Amino acid sequence: MKKILLLLLLLSGCHSIVVPDSFTYKEIKTNTYKLASWQKITDKKSPVRIYIEGDGYAFNHLGYPTTNPTPHSTFLREIAFTDPNPNVVYLARPCQFVKDERCSVKDWTTGRFSQDIINSATQAITNISNKHHIILIGYSGGALLSGLVIEQNPKLPVKKWITLAGVLNHTKWTDDLNLPPLKDSVDLKKLPTISQLHLIGDKDKTVSYKLTEKLVDNKNLIVIPKATHDKGYTNYLSKIYEK
């Protein structure tokens, strides 16, 4: 029987979501942060597909930083929880879904891609993979974080990188939207050269598909007609779920 996850009962104002019984909640403690994850691991020989969440509820509708970055959108969780592959993990970003004394507003604003954040994600991914091959699927800011993990850890056995509505360079992204720079964050020097696929909607107002077109090879890009930042991907799930 399916169970209703109420975001660990720690949060308010967020959407609940039905989590399949095949997924188990695990809190991963790294040297810097605690990370929430939901894991389905059923085949020791298959790659582990790790979905990395976006920046979440970092700013309110007035543009001010929030006190809790846990995502209100269930977009990525829904995709992860319906992935039919045997080994699937949804990995939240630091400070999402958990109470962690280490967290500060900087961790989901100017420092959302800091070295401490990257190190924490790397430790969590290494812990989850347990020497399995890895497919990283990053959504929005999670795309850049996953790219940074790949860039800084060439020995990590990542066989494929998939991004959904992904920020691929935060300097160019903030410039494109005329936003303040993320002064406490690390940026990608160049995109990884591993097998990759980038999906983005042509109606996405958070990340411009035109910017993505400038950054990735056309053969690795799918621009989805009428898709927004968190809607319109249903007909392309098979591309995401490919091994």
Residue ranges and their predicted role:
Residues 137-146:
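Gly/Ala-rich beta-loop-alpha elbow adjacent to hydrolase catalytic centers
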Residues 166, 171-231:
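The feature captures the conserved acid-bearing segment of alpha/beta-hydrolase catalytic domains
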Residues 15-17:
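Bacterial signal peptide processing site
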Residues 232-243:
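Post-His helix in hydrolase/transferase enzymes
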Residues 31-36, 41-92:
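Short, surface-exposed "cap/lid" segments of acyl-processing enzymes
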Residues 103-129:
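Alpha/beta-hydrolase active-site loop
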Residues 148-159:
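Conserved hydrolase catalytic core segment
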